[in-house]
Amino acid sequence: MKHELSALKPLFILLPLLVLGFVLFWTLFGGTLSKDFQFKSAPSEQFTQEEIQGAADVALRRFKYGFSGCTMTKLQYVDAYASSDTWNWAAEYNADEGVVFHSTFTTDDFFAPKNGFNPNDTYAYQWYVARSNGGHWKIVNLGQG
């Protein structure tokens, strides 16, 4: 039994180091916001500014941890695309409320191509964020448009 535990000792040392390395990598090399980043939000008939900010935070978090080599310059809430009685797109994702953000980001020449983006380019991206019963926001769709 003692011999089996000593054989696992390198694993107990290596595993935390790998986890730490992974966390540091995504912290240092994840998506970033530009120095002149702008978040634009017009008044909404459906959502408070706090609700819009909460949904925006979900999109920004996804950008931070999923878009290494990219720098976001703008994120804008578009009230006209919010899920509504006349166009309830959120229902397609089993949700009852949804908001849409338009963003612009640039890519670098090292990390971005590894994520499928052209190097040194600018992208317009949409983020569809939805929730049910006033619960937590989640991204249900995203992409160029």
Where do the PLM segments sit?
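Flexible low-complexity loop/turn motifs enriched in small/helix-breaking residues
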Residues: 3-16, 20-113, 117-121
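Short beta-strand edge/turn micro-motifs at domain boundaries
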Residues: 122-145
